Amino acid sequence: MIKFGKGVVKHRVLILIVAFALLIPSGLSFINTRINFDILSYLPSQIETMKGQDIMVDEFGTGALSFVILEDMKDQDIETLADDIEDLEGVKDVIWYGTIADSTLPREAIPDEVYNAFNNKDANSQLMLVTYSDTMGSDETMEAVNKMDKMVKHHCFVAGMAAVNADTKTLVMQQAPIYVIIAALLSMLVMGITMDSIIVPMLFLLSIGMAIIYNLGTNFIQGQISYLTLALTAVLQLAVTMDYSIFLWHSYQEQIDRYDGDKKRAMAHAISHTIVSVTGSSITTIAGFVALCFMSFTLGLDLGIVMAKGVVFGVIGCVTILPALILACDKAIEKTKHKILMPDVSRIASWVTNHYKILAVIFIVVLIPAIYGYTHDQVYYDLAGTMPDSAYSKQANERLDKEYAMGATHIIIAPSDMSKADSISMIDDIKKVDGVKLAVSLDSILGPTIPDDMVPDEAKEIFKNGDYQMMLVSSKYETASDEVNNQITEIKKIVKNYSKDAMLIGEAPCTKDLITITDTDFKRVSAVSIVLIFLIILIVFKSVSLPIILVAVIEFAIFVNMGIPGFTGTKLPFIASIVIGTIQLGATVDYAILMTTKYRKNRYTGMDKKPAITKALADSTNSVIVSALCFFAATFGVGLYSNIDMISSICILLARGAIISMFVVVFILPSMFMIFDKVICATSAGFKNKNLTA
């Protein structure tokens, strides 16, 4: 690797020219990469709810719907508004009771339950159903929602997942750049305190920032990325890959002393040492992200690929761009050096190795409640619930529930040749299910006495088209609640009893599938990440015992972090419980590998157990603390700022996890080394030097 290091030093100017030039195509590519704001679209395409969604789009030309609450408006004004909304690009149909009750079908002919579902006399409001020609996450649909918001603002409210997605887009696009600024500033503050230079932290951030842009610029290979991936990528890549920059800098400082101030030679050797050292840790981090790709819920694949790429770009930038920047700015670095403000914490090492038995007892005592809390976490799946109270969509959903007692809305897709009698009978059976507020089909609205030719063609086309007909079920229960999930199960039984080809779709059925699928995914991802990292540690250290010890200690840190919400009663967004463990495992193993490598080196040189572990800990502590504090600062700041709960919760958990992992690696891991030193030396390569005599 020394040849590579010398090559980087020799061609450092060319490297910087190419690196800065690549920012242009990367930036343009990033700008033109589509962002997907529809989390439910990542469900497997083969499940019935997603197949039904495709039928809705293909057969009815409808992919989503919204409810619009209209307050203090006269019928003629509503009719005008309905026409204006229907003219919007992306809107397919607008349905209110006036759509059905036209001159050919008087108000008296409409069932009271249908009329009452669209009208609330006490609140002086009416309800309008808007259907869209594309899915609820399409750009066209979200743009239509935004235009509707402007048209009906102040006295009207747009509810539903399409509105939630539109609000999410607005918030994320406003806040994502601020996330990066917060993470960068707080990381720089930490490095300013813990390092001896003002310029070097800036160079770290510049190098990592360029790697982030390369990463975002190559997302075109996926076609699109999720908003969650967009929001978290820069922050996580900064936090996760900062280790490599810190390691290069420390190695560079050591090599300068070794080569009497020859900085070019020192940098060449520092690059060589860094490549060797970060290979194992970066591969384990990548493995953690790759584990996310094994999820059936393909949001994991989306985040996993982007973050794995991010680590690769981070490593490449660390051994090419960063060394070139450091050498180019050498004079400025020397002029701006200052005293390190953080106290030397390496003295902790001797205390840890002297009290390892007490620390081991603490490990066991804390482990049991940590596992209990970890297994009793409360998770929520209501995507609308992640929005801040200030979001119009959340206010609209709450008003919809308050004024119309309307929670989730289900859609039944049934064969169009289902008999009128069966259609009416099925709707009657569905009405008997607990929590069903309204169930309608075109046949049930007309009843057995009203002939089809009395129904406006517009209304017919909404409910029947080609081989399928559409029926609506309004539930009193909220999406993702146990009550609505039980309701969905009962309705599915009824629907399938009348037609095996009929399907129940909508936000709530999709969310029920999401719950089932992600529960399995969580177990799969946890198992895959542990196995992959176990195997990598096994290969890197050629040890049977070390993978068990390292993974066990890191899993302990994860149990503690994820166990806290179990005791505080904090509800976590479903995706947090899946990704936190994987990211924390992949990031924390870097600290553990750094310390283990030094421990192995010390034992190989002939040092006894206690001095070897004490020195390894002393030499690693500062690096571990600086890296962990940078990770904490980057994620904690974003967690405090973001008012999107899904992003905020993940960042707060990652921040807390970084601190917990830091303490576990500094205090618990060396204690395990003290206890299992004989086993480790006997079952691992590179711990004993046969050429040394006792």
Give residue ranges: language-model regions.
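Membrane-embedded transmembrane helical bundles of large multi-pass transporters/channels
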Residues: 1-35, 136-381, 496-694
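Structured non-transmembrane domains adjacent to transmembrane bundles in polytopic membrane proteins
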Residues: 45-162, 378-546, 552-571
